[in-house]
């Protein structure tokens, strides 16, 4: 799959923040009205000085894996809190270029709109791949929320500075919730409904859980 080269990645942290703020003005949290057909889940890992990006594409209705694409490359940027996308996107885009199946929506193991500058990896990536995106995170980055009920499917909203930025979703009874946020070109209802569709028997929804399992398997090779 091709992507739009929105900006370069070798810049100072100060310039990275400027880019985030500029792109944040262009985020569109709009309703995705169709039922997806094919969707992809993305997981990234950084063993030693390398980056590994895995894209798992699944049939939305059947919940079946139809493709696994990955890329490995050297990592040049250190981890900087709040600027993770600048470290992760280059390796993700290498995997994206190898992808031969076009997904309707792309899920990321990470944040979307629930970011200090509303520019988590899922949101940032959408400008390059020009696809609707959703972030599914295991933990909260920022914001305040009321704990959702203990039953599967119960949820509350995550807020930051009085703005709704995400969803705190219980994917299993009596298990810690996941933090879901729209990336771009979807709304909060889409992010909730499409994520919950993949909440089968595990805490982590299948769309990013499968990607993580393949990441762990590839790391052991």
From Swiss-Prot:
Q: What is its main location?
A: cytoplasm
Alphabetized UniProt keyword annotations:
Cytoplasm, DNA damage, DNA repair, Endonuclease, Hydrolase, Magnesium, Metal-binding, Nuclease
Give the Pfam families listed for this entry.
Endonuclease_5
Positions the record marks as coiled coil are: none
The entry's Mg(2+)-binding residues are 43, 109
EC number of the protein: 3.1.21.7
Reaction(s) catalyzed by this protein?
Endonucleolytic cleavage at apurinic or apyrimidinic sites to products with a 5'-phosphate
Cofactor(s), by name: Mg(2+)
Question: What InterPro entries does the record tag this protein with?
Answer: Endonuclease-V (IPR007581), Endonuclease_V-like (IPR053396)
Root EC class: hydrolase
Query: Which residue positions does the secretion signal occupy?
Result: none
Q: Which molecular-function annotation in GO is an example for this chain?
A: magnesium ion binding
Keyword set includes Hydrolase: yes
* KW Nuclease (keyword) present: yes
Name the site position(s) for Interaction with target DNA. 79
Q: Name one GO cellular component term.
A: cytoplasm
CDD domains in the cross-refs: Endonuclease_V (cd06559)
One biological process term from GO is:
DNA repair
Which subcellular locations apply to this protein?
Cytoplasm
Family the UniProt entry places it in? Belongs to the endonuclease V family.
Stated role: DNA repair enzyme involved in the repair of deaminated bases. Selectively cleaves double-stranded DNA at the second phosphodiester bond 3' to a deoxyinosine leaving behind the intact lesion on the nicked DNA.
The record's section on NCBIfam families has: endonuc_V_Ttgales
Q: What is this protein called?
A: Endonuclease V
Organism the protein comes from: Petrotoga mobilis (strain DSM 10674 / SJ95)
UniProt lists the gene as: nfi
